[in-house]
Amino acid sequence: MVRDIEDEIRDEKNPRPLDEDDIALLKTYGLGPYSAPIKKVEKEIKDLAKKINDLCGIKESDTGLAPPSQWDLVSDKQMMQEEQPLQVARCTKIISPNTEDAKYVINVKQIAKFVVGLGDKVSPTDIEEGMRVGVDRNKYQIQIPLPPKIDPSVTMMTVEEKPDVTYNDVGGCKEQIEKMREVVELPMLHPEKFVKLGIDPPKGVLCYGPPGTGKTLLARAVANRTDACFIRVIGSELVQKYVGEGARMVRELFQMARSKKACIVFFDEVDAIGGARFDDGVGGDNEVQRTMLEIVNQLDGFDARGNIKVLMATNRPDTLDPALLRPGRLDRKVEFGLPDLESRTQIFKIHTRTMNCERDIRFELLARLCPNSTGADIRSVCTEAGMYAIRARRKTVTEKDFLDAVNKVIKGYQKFSATPKYMVYN
């Protein structure tokens, strides 16, 4: 007993040093299970804060710039000299092409014409006569080729976001959908079928019929279905104030379409610019006729159209110019007539697909109560039925709401309907 006490006193006076295992064990005291990830994140935050402070410069400075001792004026000046702004010019002629001594005649707008050479970064095969180029401001050497100039209003006609309309949303147009897909989708997806038969695929479609029968809706479904570039043009957009502006927009439109791998151009309300030519003695419609003639030339003129499909929609096919309607320009004419009983029933089911309706609604009965109605009229009936349910503070639409809506829209608005008049034109 006394000996053990003496050994403990001796150990306290002469403690033994800690080895590596003891030190590692002591470091783990007070640490949780997520200590290592937390330390790693704290280190990353600290490094990021240091990087931000270095980029921000001096906080006390009004400009936020680094101190003058850290400025590198020589490298900044060299960088400015290397990245000089270029001037836009047009290459009008190539002298001695395909040789080492080739020279290029450029026209700098509002300055002069120059005979220049190529820069170090440009290949001779990249430059063609008539194209826009970027030249430096000192020697006017060609530095880069530029794309053709296109009006921003023409560029904005391209549909970037695909519409959310599919072929299943177009009711009562089964035959029209098949004809449209044969012209648009089949040549793009299976061109070898036309090559084996030795025929050219149809390149244009004219959709005509009364208002509200689904012409524009089907074009939106085509834009959703295909991966080709889709350009939508409203006829009135091409009617410009100044002489030659509309024809220029048409040329730039087809020039942009030819630059794409595959393109679909949809002219909505084409009767605004495609009317038959006549002389009113005043000359007020001369500009519209020039625009129409440019479209006729682009559709099937001296230059090939390329892989461009053209869709046109109108309510008045009788007013269009015969030169616009001939085969080769518009190969197929698709009529959008009034839907029959089965088609009207299908349209009712399409428009009520997202509505909270009772299950026992007789859509065929509603379709029988809407004779000679278009798809737009049926959609208006569905919307009005929902309004009746909202007025009654109900969460579901009943069949009585649809019957009241039919009585209001189909019978009450009959005097505003222009369908009989347009049926005469079509």
From Swiss-Prot:
Its Gene Ontology cellular component terms are: cytoplasm; nucleus; proteasome complex
- From the Swiss-Prot or TrEMBL record, state where the protein is found: Cytoplasm; Nucleus
Coiled coil feature spans: none
Superkingdom classification of source: Eukaryota
GO molecular function terms attached to this record: ATP binding; ATP hydrolysis activity
Its main subcellular localisation, reduced to a broad class, is: cytoplasm
SMART domains for this protein: AAA
Keywords, ordered alphabetically: ATP-binding, Cytoplasm, Isopeptide bond, Nucleotide-binding, Nucleus, Proteasome, Ubl conjugation
| Matches recorded under InterPro entries | 26S_Proteasome_ATPase, AAA+_ATPase, AAA_lid_3, ATPase_AAA_core, ATPase_AAA_CS, NA-bd_OB-fold, P-loop_NTPase, PRS7-like_OB
Q: Which residues take part in binding ATP? A: 209-216
Gene3D superfamilies this protein is in? 1.10.8.60, Nucleic acid-binding proteins, P-loop containing nucleotide triphosphate hydrolases
Q: Where is this cross-link: Glycyl lysine isopeptide (Lys-Gly) (interchain with G-Cter in ubiquitin)?
A: 400, 415
Entry-linked PANTHER family:
26S PROTEASOME REGULATORY SUBUNIT
The entry's family comment says:
Belongs to the AAA ATPase family.
Per UniProt, subunit arrangement is:
Component of the 19S regulatory particle (RP/PA700) base subcomplex of the 26S proteasome. The 26S proteasome is composed of a core protease (CP), known as the 20S proteasome, capped at one or both ends by the 19S regulatory particle (RP/PA700). The RP/PA700 complex is composed of at least 17 different subunits in two subcomplexes, the base and the lid, which form the portions proximal and distal to the 20S proteolytic core, respectively.
Please describe what this protein does: The 26S proteasome is involved in the ATP-dependent degradation of ubiquitinated proteins. The regulatory (or ATPase) complex confers ATP dependency and substrate specificity to the 26S complex.
Protein name per its UniProtKB record: 26S proteasome regulatory subunit 7 homolog A
Q: What organism, scientifically named, is this protein from?
A: Arabidopsis thaliana
